[in-house]
Amino acid sequence: MPAENVVGEPGQGWTYAKFLLFHERTSIAGAPQLRRGLNGLVKRAEKIFHNDSPLSEDPFFKSKVAQIELDLSALEMTELRGLAAEREGKGPGAESSLLKIKGTELQQRLTSLALEAAGHEAIPFGGPYGFKDQEVSSSKAAQLTAAKYLNFRKVTIYGGT
């Protein structure tokens, strides 16, 4: 390889790779996106009614939200610990792998709960995969739920594995 094409210092490739993997895995965990998604789901659940009461008041739904909330808080704290260690000059540790695994599992649990909450309104209408020329009464968020659910099935196997 010509010297002008070398990036960084020769012999430091693995050090650079670990740095990149740490940040890739941390970003795939998606704690801020998970927080926004959970908050959005809870807000939408206030407008979804089942047996004349909002889904947000259903004890089973609340229990699932609480478990995701607890696991998300743990994920956020782990992310902050990893970033603090990096700031102190310590190399990336196992946190990045843990973040990637737990974060992607949380993404899948959240999209599963969102799909469950949206129910039949998650059936896609319009676009290349939906039913064309149908009147749609569900919200855009509900219509995107199935696509997000299906898309997030892949996150556990890409990036940093």
Predicted segments, located by residue:
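Short basic/hydrophobic patches in alpha-helices and adjacent helix-turn junctions
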Residues: Q67, E105, E116, K154-V155
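Hydrophobic, well-ordered secondary-structure elements that form the walls
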Residues: V65, G103, G160
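C-terminal helix-coil-helix/basic helical segment that borders enzyme active sites and/or dimer interfaces
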Residues: H50, P59, S73-V136
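Enrichment for repetitive, rod-forming helical segments
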Residues: R25, P32, E69, Q107, ...
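Glycine-rich phosphate/cofactor-binding loops in nucleotide/flavin-utilizing enzymes
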Residues: V6, G11-A31, E121-T161
